[in-house]
Amino acid sequence: MKLIASFSIFMLMSIWSFASLGQSNSFDSLFSNEPEFLKVDQAFVFDYVQNGDQLVVTWDIADDYYLYQQQFKAVSKNASLGEPIFPTGKMKEDEFFDEPQEVYYHKVSVTYPILQSQDDSAVKIRYQGCAEAGLCYPPTTQVVYLNAVNASDDLSNTDEASVESSGSVSQQFELADLLTGDQSLIWVLLIFLALGVGLAFTPCVFPMYPILSGIVIGQGKSISTSRAFVLSFVYVQGMALTYSLLGLVVASAGVQFQAALQHPIILGALIVVFALLALVMFGAWEFQLPSSWQEKLNGVSNQQKSGSYLGVLLMGAISGLVASPCTTAPLTGILLYIAQTSDLLLGFSALYALSLGMGIPLILFGITGGKLLPKAGAWMNIIKVTFGFMMLAVALMFVERLVSHMATDILWSLLGLVTFSYFYVMNQASSVTFGKGVRALVIFIGLFASAMYGYQTIFGQTSSVAGHTEQSHPRFEVVKNLDDFEQKLAAANAQGKTVMVDLYADWCVACKEFEKYTFPDTQVVDALSNTVWMQIDLTDNTATNIAFQEHFSILGLPTILFFDLQGKEISGSRVTGFMQASAFAAHAKNIL
């Protein structure tokens, strides 16, 4: 309902339209799932030896596992290596590549000629392999150290050289490869800038648009394009800096920080703020600084220009802090990298580029919005009221984290009815044109959809519940603490059952979507028929919950874990972010 209402409003205003919204499973290819597994250092046992001017690197490969020849890469510092000497492998058709790949089974040795090296010269060896059953590992790096080897006469003096194999990398490993590989910083930033542009068309960034629009509108009808650009750019800088700094905090604090921001008191304050902003847009009251303050700012800041920039920067920072509840795959990948390494500079830079990419459409929207603002007449009021409804929609996004699904669904229905009713009245007052007919059609569709959504919520609830009685998922076993979890896990394994652990919080919208749409589905219930369902409530920042987060290395919610019959978490099985029932059922069948 909320997406339909928002989309219809945007069509009426002809400002922008949202791209199709994918669920977290659009990034599912970044994470592999495999029921039986070995750790990467067990699947591919690494060893090396230096024989004079040759470095021989060897891998003992477990049965039913293999390494890709084209994924071997060596980067040396204070040394120079020649072209690697590979043995002949086997050609394999692999779903992750467009053409057959040469792979190695059981054991492989690769020889690197050492053209020149110093004592303790370092060489980073990177490799990547898969299991026949379907699990593929991210690229893995080992560091080896060399003894001194004198350079040949025809060798040019160089401090650093690299020998690498060419070949495509499957999409599953692209993000990990960007951060762990040796691409230039500029290339990494460009990639994440592009990812950010894609994220700009998701619900995470939706609240930014009405906020930025309100800032542009607040500058008056005579705002210039350059002024609109500067305001939009400053706003985006505030947002980008917030995401970058927040990312570093989240990487170290995990869900604790996210939970603090989602405390009911803070959410309630945000709801009030956006509701008041909506009233301002409706013209119910004026929001401005006291006249004495305005006079001082006018005198010091040349009619508030500097003050406005600072205010816009702060608004962008606050917006980035409170209006992005989603945990996306690119953001999660960067945060995991920061948390597991000491390379904060690269992590911060990648986060900033990602955030800046998210801001590019915002800047374009701010400029376009400034141009499209009516110079005079009744349409100015219609635009302001429209953004008022958008402010209410943002407030509702926070409300749904505090109340039941049924209550929020009814509120969405009412908001849609009120919004489209207002547009109906305004459209009736306009002159008869082709555009009026088109607007009327969109308005009636919006009214009908809003009414049906509310009807289905109120009167369809009973039949919906009744229809799912026999398909209700097993009752979750509530886990109190880590000791309780270990006991319940052991008890489940003793019964020959695997375990699924749902980590959720009351403020987590996607957690509620799992509960409403995914868990009750027949496919999911059948796929987890021999699995004990456990649940950990991370709503509050208690010492017990912090221990859970640290023990399981939780970055965001929802997170769902799977444990095998030996009580170990299944490699690559974690689900982060909402997943639809069919995809979740397939995921469960693949790993259990």
Curated annotation (Swiss-Prot):
Naturally occurring in which organism (per UniProt): Pseudoalteromonas atlantica (strain T6c / ATCC BAA-1087)
Pfam families named in the record: DsbD_N, DsbD_TM, Thioredoxin_7
Keyword Electron transport recorded: yes
Entries under HAMAP family matching the protein: DbsD
Disulfide bond sites: C130-C136, C204-C326, C508-C511
Biological processes, Gene Ontology terms: cell redox homeostasis; cytochrome complex assembly
The organism's place on the tree of life at top rank: Bacteria
Family of the protein in this entry: Belongs to the thioredoxin family. DsbD subfamily.
Region forming the signal peptide: 1-19
Membrane topology label: Multi-pass membrane protein
Catalytic activity: [protein]-dithiol + NAD(+) = [protein]-disulfide + NADH + H(+); [protein]-dithiol + NADP(+) = [protein]-disulfide + NADPH + H(+)
Protein name (Swiss-Prot/TrEMBL): Thiol:disulfide interchange protein DsbD
Record GO cellular component, one term: plasma membrane
GO MF: electron transfer activity; protein-disulfide reductase [NAD(P)H] activity
Stated role: Required to facilitate the formation of correct disulfide bonds in some periplasmic proteins and for the assembly of the periplasmic c-type cytochromes. Acts by transferring electrons from cytoplasmic thioredoxin to the periplasm. This transfer involves a cascade of disulfide bond formation and reduction steps.
